[in-house]
Amino acid sequence: MSDKHINLVIVTGMSGAGKTVAIQSFEDLGYFTIDNMPPALVPKFLELIEQTNENRRVALVVDMRSRLFFKEINSTLDSIESNPSIDFRILFLDATDGELVSRYKETRRSHPLAADGRVLDGIRLERELLSPLKSMSQHVVDTTKLTPRQLRKTISDQFSEGSNQPSFRIEVMSFGFKYGLPLDADLVFDVRFLPNPYYQVELREKTGLDEDVFNYVMSHPESEVFYKHLLNLIVPILPAYQKEGKSVLTVAIGCTGGQHRSVAFAHCLAESLATDWSVNESHRDQNRRKETVNRS
């Protein structure tokens, strides 16, 4: 690998989806970072980086705050892609319309595309305009249910590697359907057909990571059959995802509340896949019911 090789991350996505937290996270990881970089200036900036011995891990926030963003972004990406000394990935941050509206109300800011002041109209227009960019992004992170701390951890897990070569990582996560589907999931599996530990009083307040809950969930005949088929489905297709250049494959397993069944299954799957692949395990909603009770 040449000393002049640059590892570039373009951070973009919906307004209000967390790009400020993201770029701060990259700075913490040792990246050279710039927020609100006009697309037309990116190629020239990268030329300057190539001519110096400065940090060659670079993260740039490029978004619609630049007035010419939608006119310039495609030609900018083409220019970057044609440079053999640059490895670049796109991180697209997203969130549901409802969550973005809530964040705008909280900050009392107006949406830059909401000409008549209606935030939701601006969000919908922005989502439509950004759809092509989202489809070409190697990393799509749904921040709807993420705290800033969780977003920072997600970015650290995906971008802290020292190598300039994009890696293939499997994100195995559990979630509760009652709290919404994870928008960044590539594969979603439903385990609500399994017996629910919630109705066992001694297991209700525990999670699928507790041994007695885990054993309860995984010992049922239906669990054994489904888990076998799950592995037989997922394992053979992993090399194909890797071959297509996908950096992160997110496998989401859901139950009603995301506390028992999905947690046990996700944990079991993560351990199985980790023997041959780089795997990160997370449980989005396992403590959500407890937090709700504590707030009441």
Curated annotation (Swiss-Prot):
It comes from the Bacteria. Keywords: ATP-binding, GTP-binding, Nucleotide-binding. GTP binds at D63, M64, R65, S66. It holds the Pfam family PapZ_C. One of its GO terms (molecular function) is ATP binding. The keyword GTP-binding applies. ATP binds at G13, M14, S15, G16, A17, G18, K19, T20. InterPro entries: P-loop_NTPase, RapZ-like, RapZ-like_N, RapZ_C. The keyword Oxidoreductase does not apply. Displays ATPase and GTPase activities. Belongs to the RapZ-like family. This is Nucleotide-binding protein MGAS2096_Spy0550.
